[in-house]
């Protein structure tokens, strides 16, 4: 069975230990493949290299990777997007990379303080958001066109945008797990992440090839 756009992640600590990777070039059959090197722990050094590979059925594909600690990062068309924005009554919605709330923060205030109610991430196929509250439900945005849309609609598609072919929120998450979420399980029933010391959402990587969003709960009493 052929694999199309199969995700590949290279651990740079294992395969390029000691090299401060600033640029990476991935080539297959003479064609450059978009890739990205991500710093996932905030130490300003790349931890992982991500790209997608096409692998033929019952065959093989050779991808050659060149890493550099001096070249400038390579630029590729954006295929993904992730953001975390603060709610602003003036409509500016400033973008932040991480936000942490104390465990006793009011759930509704926390939920409403973020534009879109949580971290948003998308590919050209679909978009998702993770609610910043004790549910942490994942909501789904369906698309009719192969493109990035969140910077245009922000999950709140207008009638005019719908008429232009934009997608929209297609799932009522409510109290469910939505498109999937982390929950506890007590007395044969799923339960929310209620008693914590703090809650945090962080955008660890924002394209162009992949996005990485971290949802963390500190000191959960379960």
Which residues make up each language-model segment?
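Alpha-mannosidase-like glycoside hydrolase catalytic domains involved in N-glycan trimming
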Residues: 1-109, 116-118
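Generic hydrophobic, helix-prone segments enriched in Leu/Val/Ile
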Residues: 8, 49, 138, 180-183
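A structural/positional concept
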Residues: 102-104, 108-166
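Extended, loop-rich substrate-binding clefts of extracytoplasmic carbohydrate-active enzymes
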Residues: 162-222
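Short strand-coil-strand connectors
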Residues: 29, 124, 216-218
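Short, surface-exposed beta-strand/loop "edge" segments at domain boundaries and coil↔beta transitions
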Residues: 33, 55-61, 128-129, 136-139, ...
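Residue-level detector of beta-strand face positions
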Residues: 25, 120, 212-214
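Extended interaction regions within the primary functional domain
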Residues: 93-96, 133-134, 142-155, 207, ...
